[in-house]
UniProtKB/Swiss-Prot annotation:
This is Integration host factor subunit beta. This protein is one of the two subunits of integration host factor, a specific DNA-binding protein that functions in genetic recombination as well as in transcriptional and translational control. Involved in hydrogenase gene expression. One of its GO terms (biological process) is regulation of translation. GO terms for molecular function: DNA binding. It comes from the Bacteria. The gene is ihfB. Belongs to the bacterial histone-like protein family. The keyword Cell membrane does not apply. Keywords: DNA recombination, DNA-binding, Transcription, Transcription regulation, Translation regulation. Heterodimer of an alpha and a beta chain.
Length: 30
């Protein structure tokens, strides 16, 4: 799984989050 796919999945499951916040969350896990 690539980073952009992970961002899309997290964003889809958390529609209340801004895209940049989702990216920050993903970056924190990586």
């Amino acid at each position: 799984m690539i980073k952009s796919e992970l961002v899309q999945i997290v964003a889809a499951r958390n529609p209340h989050l801004y895209h940049r916040d989702v990216e920050n969350i993903v970056n924190a896990f990586l």
